[in-house]
Design a protein with these regions (language model features):
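Periplasmic N-terminal accessory/gating domains of Gram-negative outer-membrane beta-barrel systems
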Residues: 1-90, 94-99, 119-126, 138-140
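Outer-membrane beta-barrel channels and translocator barrels
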Residues: 6, 47, 78, 105-107, ...
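Extracellular loop and loop/strand-boundary signature of outer-membrane beta-barrel proteins
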Residues: 66, 125-129, 213-218, 261-268, ...
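Short strand-turn segments of transmembrane beta-barrel domains in outer membranes
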Residues: 79-88, 96-146, 159, 215-221
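Transmembrane beta-strands of outer-membrane beta-barrel proteins
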Residues: 111-115, 153-157, 242-244, 291-295
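Transmembrane beta-strands of outer-membrane beta-barrel pores
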Residues: 117-123, 161-165, 248-252, 297-301
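Transmembrane beta-barrel wall of Gram-negative outer-membrane proteins
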Residues: 132-252, 272-286
Length: 314
């Protein structure tokens, strides 16, 4: 997984056969972008027909179902990705299209660490206005190993912090309103100017809407996500193992719609915080028999709306 050309583990679905992952901001289902939902379709099925799991236990948005903003597990926390597009066993309920299961990392007998950083600062340094507005930074870290003085207990910790100064960036033409903001021109005014102004062909494009005052690149919204994962593994005996894991995600996004092209402050914001605690107990009875007990607590809080904004400047 670490060597794949992906920035987010949700892009793993793009690499699977028969899967279409729709970019909500481009051509997705209406309102899915506002809700921060991922659209993953398997062989023509709906996005809500996939069972998403971490270490064999379900995760999903408790209101809309599926996954999306606020349900990101950093890639240094994933040891293996199990994907079953149909034909899965009856043990997997609430799934018609596919089953997705992330097997998480565990600490080993030796200390290990990983670090990765991506940024748009290089493009900005080369003079790219687009990269300057984008202001993209992505940090990935992972480390783990045995806990000192407790050889039977191993720890793994990983985290990812992603920040983008603009959710979407558009390039506008250089035709802007060159007059006072409150000065409007009716169709009759423009017709008179066309007939009387000798320089009409040179200045006619300046008589645009008074709110059209931007030229070049402009960013809208933002997207910030931080998630971290920790896992303790206790090898009680060669036949008994206890695992405790904790996963936390804090996501804050402000998307963009053309309705808010001239008043981005009125666009909805999405706060979505996820917390998952899990306990797993493995007991190997003999060479042919074993059992596993799992319990987890998955909580996802969210706020969608406009906050702390004076929408009419009164």
């Amino acid at each position: 997984i670490e060597t794949l050309p992906i920035r987010d583990v949700s892009q793993l679905y793009d690499l699977q056969s028969g899967v279409v992952r729709v970019e909500s901001r481009l051509q997705g289902i209406p309102d899915h972008e506002d809700r921060g939902l991922e659209e993953v379709h398997v062989r023509g099925g709906r996005s809500g027909e996939i069972a998403y799991m971490i270490d064999g236990m379900y995760i999903r948005n408790p209101i809309y179902g599926g996954i999306g903003n606020g349900t990101r597990l950093n890639k240094f926390a994933i040891r293996e990705f199990d994907w079953q597009p149909g034909g899965f066993n009856a043990e997997y309920g609430d799934a018609m299209s596919a089953v997705s299961n992330y097997h998480t990392m565990s600490g080993t007998n030796s200390f290990a660490y990983k670090f990765q950083y991506e940024t748009s600062m290089l493009g900005e340094a080369l003079g790219s206005r687009y990269d300057e507005i984008r202001d993209y930074h992505d940090y990935n870290i992972g480390l783990g190993g045995p806990i000192p003085f407790f050889k039977k207990i191993k720890l793994w910790f990983s985290g990812q912090q992603t920040s983008s100064g603009a959710y979407q960036i558009y390039e506008f033409d250089n035709i802007t309103h060159n007059y006072e903001r409150d000065k409007y021109f009716t169709l009759n005014d423009l017709n008179d100017l066309r007939n009387t102004d000798p320089n009409w062909d040179q200045v006619k494009y300046s008589y645009v809407a008074p709110w059209d005052d931007t030229e070049g690149f402009k960013g809208f919204g933002f997207d910030n996500t931080t998630d971290y994962f920790a896992k303790l593994t206790y090898d009680i005996t060669s036949q008994l193992k206890l695992t405790l894991s904790y996963w936390n995600v804090e996501a804050h996004r402000k998307g963009f719609k053309t309705n808010f092209l001239y008043w981005n402050d009125g666009q909805n914001e999405i706060f979505r915080d996820t917390e998952r605690k899990a306990l797993e107990f493995n007991h190997t009875i003999n060479e042919k028999s074993f059992y596993t007990l799992r319990i987890s607590d998955f909580v996802q809080d969210q706020f969608i709306g406009v906050r702390w904004q004076d929408s009419d400047n009164d």
